[in-house]
Amino acid sequence: GRTAHYIPELAKVNPNLFGISICDTNGNLFSIGDHNKPIAVESISKLFSLAFAIKKYGIKTVHNKIGMHGSFLPFNSILAAKLSPSLTINPFLNQGAMATTSLLYQKNLRKYKESLIKNMSNYASSSLRVGRMVYASESKTNDVNMSLAYLLKSADRFYAPVEPSVDAYTYQCSTMVTSDNLARMASVFANGGINPTNQKSLLSKKQTAYILNNLLPEGLYEYSDDWIARTGGRAYAKSGVGGGILIVIPGI
């Protein structure tokens, strides 16, 4: 692979960085390589905004407003949205992810954005921060996302003002994480919604199962089918163009 050149700041990332971290359901962390080097979380954040929305509104409401339709098209495809009866498709493609973030809208933009980072920090058992240079870079190159959001808004499938919501979505994607952070974040889902690092309950088992069942066919976009075939559907993965992959193996 190669770095994401359509976001200038991500194009500067060292492509030779490589780290692996594993956090088991007892909270034990094992790491090798560049496990303390921060990268932008990018689309992995979609998993956590979905969890946040489900925690706040419940499965039924989020399912009805966001949808869970599969797609063979790229994650930011306007055509994919147009071809879907509900337009949003699912929360793991950009249009559905931004619609999910719009459900979490607050009039105070600073508090709105900070709530998204705080939510991810709860899963990481660590105070995460936003990469300001990444955020600035992405904010200058998010025209497609803005177009998708306005398309959804025109069909009443976007639930807050477009510009602050897309800004908040860009902000959450610019959060910096290490592989250690990602491992601890994944461990919450592996442990049925309980953070094994501090024993805090973040999701119910039912909510966790719903999220994972819908992550499986879309977490790696058009490569998800190949992933399922290779893993037997036992590992749930979410990728991000920042270079990270989060993998959940329930019970381990």
Predicted feature locations:
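Short, well-ordered beta-strand elements
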Residues: 30-32, 102, 251-252
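Active-site-adjacent helix/loop patches that line small-molecule binding or acyl-intermediate pockets
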Residues: 1, 53-172
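Active-site-proximal alpha-helical segments within enzyme catalytic domains
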Residues: 47, 53, 176-195, 244, ...
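A short, well-structured edge-of-sheet supersecondary motif
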Residues: 1-32, 246-247
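Cytosolic covalent-transfer regions centered on His/Cys nucleophiles
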Residues: 166-169, 173, 177, 192, ...
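Structured C-terminal helix/loop/strand segments within mature extracytoplasmic catalytic/sensor domains
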Residues: 190-252
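Active-site SXXK
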Residues: 27, 40-63, 185
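Short Gly/Pro-enriched turn/cap motifs at secondary-structure boundaries
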Residues: 10-13, 89-90, 140, 234-238, ...
